[in-house]
């Protein structure tokens, strides 16, 4: 948390002081994203919601106490007729005003369904925690990949700038020699064209850097107008390519998707038991302490008008018949559990395929890097030789252009190999559930 405050303070100071750029490390970017991104905040709040829901379920175990009061004004009293020796007499029955009030209490003693639902509530909280963990891992993966993408864009910009600088330098040399008549006009025009051809790649690479930085800032929840940059280069992370990965040692034990399926399966299994427990008798106790008062004058001040009464009892409820509702609910719960198990099997198969694909991509990227790295060394040497040959009049601009193209392709391939390895590795770590931060 202290590091997060320092990072945010650095960003604010950079904005207020008008600094050209504020540079972020990968660790700082992850800290900002995990604290500022709305997706993470929503996931954390969902945990609190489930915890409150769990508390609400547990409250069903405690006595329920209510206070009530009722006042009634009789508009037309009931009439009772009686026969006395052949004569019928009618009598008005009741009082003009009546009042009832007091306390009632009830508490479950034996309720198997309620007890089972408490376990479901606890599992629901665990599921919310696991979903929050999944959201954090998703964010770590997205931010890390976005960070690597910025580094790749900057590396590509560096390559194209070197190509442009080399073209400008060669053009200067050709121009000097053209002015003294030692090279043809064709060579001079060709060198000018090489400079002009190199410029669009630089502009496009610069635009790619800006766009990738915007994407990173969006993930971090930052103002898109804030001027930031990232620290380091792709080569700083290439040491990860030396790590050995064995498919037989990889498993899905910590995979967040599989953990969510496990929790959901437990919840559905509990739900099935709850539907079966609907046929189990329940026992509850209840009690009340009430007052009642009757009067025709609307006054209840006389203590004699108030009559208290109370009771306590035990209620036994035995389910006997409710149509086919309980049987249908049980069958529905069984089907839901079966469907989830089939989905789990399918997702597990897909995750294992993705795990193998990521591992193969990493291994291929290592081979591509080794090949491209060796090619860069040779291509640099070839370019230097072609320039020297042209300077002494034994080479041509075509040789320089060809060697420059070979060097450019080799450097881009090397950078792409590192980038592909890193993105495949972060995807594999996500599948394995190793992106804890």
Place the predicted regions along the sequence by residue.
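Bacterial Sec-dependent N-terminal signal peptides
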Residues: 1-30, 34, 436-437
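Periplasmic alpha-helical coiled-coil/stalk elements that build and connect Gram-negative outer-membrane
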Residues: 3, 138-252, 361, 365
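Acidic, low-complexity, intrinsically disordered peripheral segments
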Residues: 6, 66, 224, 413-437
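Bacterial Sec-pathway N-terminal export signals of envelope proteins
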Residues: 19-66, 70, 76, 224, ...
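Sec/SRP-type N-terminal targeting helices
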Residues: 41-45, 58-59, 109-136, 161, ...
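Outer-membrane beta-barrel architecture
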Residues: 55, 104, 271-274, 315-317
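Small/polar, glycine/serine/threonine/aspartate-rich low-complexity segments that form flexible
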Residues: 68-104, 232-241, 286-318
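A short glycine-centered flexible hinge/capping loop motif at secondary-structure junctions
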Residues: 178-182, 390-394, 431
């Amino acid at each position: 948390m202290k590091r997060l405050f320092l990072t945010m303070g650095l960003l604010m100071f950079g904005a207020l002081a008008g600094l050209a750029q504020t540079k972020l490390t990968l660790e700082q970017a992850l800290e900002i994203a995990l604290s500022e991104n709305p997706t993470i905040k929503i996931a954390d709040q969902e945990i609190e919601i489930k915890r409150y829901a769990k508390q609400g379920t547990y409250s069903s175990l405690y006595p329920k106490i209510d206070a009530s009061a009722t006042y009634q004004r009789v508009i037309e009293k009931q009439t009772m007729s009686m026969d006395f020796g052949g004569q019928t007499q009618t009598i008005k029955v009741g009082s003009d005003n009546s009042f009832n009030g007091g306390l009632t209490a009830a508490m479950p003693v034996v309720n198997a369904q309620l007890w089972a639902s408490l376990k479901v509530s606890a599992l629901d909280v665990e599921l919310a925690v696991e979903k929050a963990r999944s959201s954090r891992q998703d964010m770590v993966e997205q931010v890390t990949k976005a960070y690597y993408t910025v580094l790749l864009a900057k590396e590509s910009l560096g390559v194209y700038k070197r190509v442009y600088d080399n073209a400008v330098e060669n053009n200067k040399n050709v121009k000097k020699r053209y002015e003294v008549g030692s090279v043809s006009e064709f060579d001079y025009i060709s060198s000018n064209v090489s400079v002009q051809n190199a410029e669009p790649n630089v502009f496009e690479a610069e635009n790619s850097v800006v766009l990738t930085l915007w994407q990173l800032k969006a993930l971090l929840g930052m103002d898109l107008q804030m001027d930031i940059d990232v620290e380091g280069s792709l080569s700083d992370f290439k040491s990860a390519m030396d790590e050995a990965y064995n498919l037989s040692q990889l498993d899905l034990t910590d995979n967040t998707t599989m953990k969510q399926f496990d929790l959901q399966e437990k919840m559905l299994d509990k739900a099935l038991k709850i539907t079966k427990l609907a046929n189990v008798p329940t026992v509850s106790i209840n009690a009340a302490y009430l007052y009642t008062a009757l009067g025709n004058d609307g006054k209840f001040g006389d203590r004699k008008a108030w009559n208290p009464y109370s009771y306590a009892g035990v209620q036994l409820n035995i389910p006997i018949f409710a149509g086919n509702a309980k049987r249908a609910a049980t069958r529905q719960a069984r089907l839901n559990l079966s469907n989830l198990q089939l989905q789990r099997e399918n997702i597990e198969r897909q995750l294992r395929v993705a795990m193998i694909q990521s591992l193969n991509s990493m291994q291929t990227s290592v081979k591509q890097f080794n090949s491209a790295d060796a090619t860069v060394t040779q291509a640099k040497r070839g370019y230097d030789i072609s320039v020297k040959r042209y300077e002494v009049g034994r080479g041509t601009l075509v040789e320089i252009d060809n060697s420059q193209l070979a060097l450019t392709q080799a450097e881009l391939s090397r950078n792409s190999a590192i980038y592909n390895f890193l993105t495949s590795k972060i995807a594999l770590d996500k599948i394995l559930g190793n992106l804890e931060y």
